[in-house]
Amino acid sequence: MADSAALLVDHILPPVDMRQWVISFPFQLRFLFANYPAVMSKVLGIFTRLISTHLIQKGGAKHSTARTGAVTFIQRFGSALNLNIHFHMLFIDGIYIDGFNKEKQVFKRVKAPTTTELNALVHKLSQRVARFLTKQGLLVEDIDNSNLTLDGLAPDPMQDLYGHSITYRVALGAQRGKKVFTLQTLAPQIEENSDSQVGSMAGFILHAGVATRGNEREKLERVCRYIARPALFEKRLAITGNGNVRYQLKTPYCDGTTDYRRSHVIFTPLDFMAKLAALVPKPRVNLTRFFGVFAPNSQYRITITQEKKPKSRMTSDKGDKWDKTVKEKRQSMTWAKRLKRVFSIDIETCEAC
């Protein structure tokens, strides 16, 4: 988490305005993405092109002369350890246009999206995803409604775990099929009107309320650490007196059946392992994607990103930095460096000296 955030801030993300876009999907699509990673990648491409077009048009430019970029983290988990595949995208909050010599890229910031624009984007996304799934033979539409057709899905023992995890139900044991037990320990909370930028339609929910300025590098790193966080936090785990697993929710929620908010979920040990198994992606599925100017093969990556290559090994004034072996370059940060980077705790310096 800390390594990924440091890599993005130090070497990839330029010192310009950035915005986090978060898109979540209906339950049926979450199940589809878990079983068909290739379909998930196609839908991610549809969403990326949609936001890119929105930014370019809002900046008053064309695709031929303007470009943008994004770093996407595909998260598979919800706050209750449920399977919830959704996308966290760090988009450049603007566009890059060609300069006078067409070699230097000039950044142009765009205004923050309004709620009306977010709702329009969600509507377009749902339509394009529906068209794509129909062409793939995965969606059958009639006059009344649309239904996913998963008849050709190859048998997989994980499908049962996926379905129960997505719908917050017990997957294994004597309580199989029942709702996961929750504790109601917090009093009702009066919800105030929020100015957060959210658009929603038919199970699609789009958030775009978190943004950073070009000079807010520490805030950007906190956002990166948040979207790169792991699924499980050990400090929220506890064992109950009867041997079950209790997991504390970061944000208590109300499911509508009672005014009291639910603060914990309870699993049997067997069902807890089933929940963790459902969060593991299929082999060779990359959960971090780079698009636009951040793509590995983009001709603009070297001129826009923070990472600069030396002209030669001899001209670098930091010779030892470029003389590192491949193994040394791939090593993670030490715990001492992580403490200093994340919590500003320098254990290598004595305060009494």
Predicted regions and their residues:
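Beta->alpha loop/short-helix hinge microenvironment recognizer with preference
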Residues: 1-353
